Amino acid sequence: IWEVIEAAKTKPFGFQAFYPGPGIGGHCIPLDPFYLEHIAKKYDFDLSMIHAAGHINMRMPHYMYIKIATALNSHKKAVNGSSILFLGVAYKPDINDERESPALDIMDVTAHKSGDVSYHDPYIPEVKTSEGRTYISADLSAEVLANSDCVVLTTNHKDFDIDFISENSKLIVDLRNMVEEEGDNIF
């Protein structure tokens, strides 16, 4: 899909790129389509595509957890007891807003499966998830990366030095297509 987006971006006009990721977030996008669907039903208008999209978006944290578990399993590790560092909890890049961020739900699902969850976000020093877990942003150092069994790229902040992250991480699950290189340790 990333190659298709790059090819489409070569169109000289009339193209707006939309990028896949671990889910939707923010104060309006996760909710507004359901308001529209509700009003449409009053007028006997079928917007089943919005309903289907909403269902898919609600399942994304579990789907992303499966990607994390699969990556760990490929390295002979289980989620249970693994140290999993999430990079970015803001719902979009370069902001300090974690409202409805998909990263928080993925962290909850992973913690529920007994993963040792932590995060780093240069814009958000502390978060509380919908399940009530509170986390403080860890320092992003070579030691923290090396001690993590899995590093999950959840928000594509421009501040993230991808080369530094790649060089110091055992395993990376890239949910934002930030790592350009390929390897056995990049999913």
Feature map (PLM): residue ranges:
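Structural/interface elements that position substrates and couple domains in central-metabolism enzymes
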Residues: 1-187
